[in-house]
Amino acid sequence: EEIWSLINTSERTRKHCMQLENCVYDFFELTTLNMAQQGVFGEILHVEGAYIHNLEDYWSSYWNNWRMDYNRNNRGDVYATHGIGPACQLLNIHRGDRMKTLVAVDTKAVNGPAYIRKTTGEEVKDFQNGDQTTTVIRTENGKTILIQHNVMTPRPYSRMYQLVGTDGYASKYPVEEYCLRPEQVDTNVVANHENLNAHGSLPEDVKRELMNKYKHPIHQELEETAK
């Protein structure tokens, strides 16, 4: 209801209303976005994002236990923005494409109720959110988005951030890597680019040169300001 109130107010007043997301400004994300916008990966077909962060050591730190309560009372991907914000930028959502269909599934709830039982003794029979939620979205132009949410089980922190294009691939977790057709790598970046292949990660030195070449203007401006 609160979200629809914002939408209705925006439409009634003819004022822009947007959801802000900080992860779009990370260095790897902005650099990869710049590469994508300049055609390095060819046509972007599929992107992935997530919020994967085991919170079992942090639940008690949230004011009035609001975060566990929210997962207890609500079902679905309750924190999609970290993953879906950068993904939407890569696919030009609302800049020529739009989300068309969505399917979301979740596992049963195990670790949430177990944590409450362990810390309070309460047996929760109706815990709403599954330990993991997986969402698949298809766009009007035939692209796909995969988003995950998991704050309940042991896993290394990850926002996934993955891009699949007709001429290349990018992934941030667990290590930052690119995979490109050799001809997509400028000879100014690596002279013997024909020795590269499209089924392995770029060598670290090539990746470094590539990221420097496609450093986003926002980061260039910030670096100049910081000098």
Please provide the spans of the model-predicted regions.
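Predominantly a Rossmann-like dinucleotide-binding segment in NAD(P)-dependent oxidoreductases
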Residues: 12-18, 23-127
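Rossmann-fold NAD(P)-binding glycine/threonine-rich loop
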Residues: 2-16
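Short, mixed charged/polar active-site loops
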Residues: 144-146, 169
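Glycine-rich phosphate/pyrophosphate-binding beta-alpha loops
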Residues: 147-158
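C-terminal glycine/acidic-rich active-site capping loop/insertion
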Residues: 111-127, 138-139, 167-227
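A short catalytic or substrate-binding loop motif that flags glycine-/basic-rich loops and adjacent residues
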Residues: 81, 126-131, 139-140, 154-155
